């Protein structure tokens, strides 16, 4: 956008859907009991420990496990990002609900903005994205929503290299949605 004050900013609404394994399949896998994957016995502890392996986390480098404490913010997308080298995961602690916006991986430099989808997680299950899945950081529905975020440290370094409201690197493309589209994308919550 060129900063012309005569431009009318468009508003595009995205309906929020329940996070189900079927609805999320194009973007990744649910982590938790809601994954639909049957647990197996660990082989120890007389059957008292069952293990479920809903996804294989992929990262070939130093990986960061961090805790994000999220506060409610306007239900408008500011950025959309993707990672090229790892499968990022969000794992809630404390059972508080949150919303995540996803876009399918694309070959080009931007997502298909007309196909973005928003999903409400109830706080009992997490999510691990496919490599290249476009997403915005979770929106909390309650104060102090704690979410474990698993991603490569290279991504953290890429995020520090902001340029014009965006960040780019070998494992990251983080785009400013308003600059790219001239529109505000808002969630129908």
Please name every model-derived segment.
Residues 88-91, 126-127, 138:
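His/acidic/aromatic-lined binding-pocket segments of jelly-roll/cupin-type domains
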Residues 120-134:
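Conserved metal-binding segment of the jelly-roll/cupin
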Residues 133-167:
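A short beta-strand-loop micro-motif that forms or neighbors metal/cofactor-
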Residues 2-118, 156-189:
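Non-catalytic, conserved peripheral segments adjacent to functional cores
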Residues 117, 125, 143-146:
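A short pocket-lining beta-strand/turn micro-motif at the edge of beta-sheets
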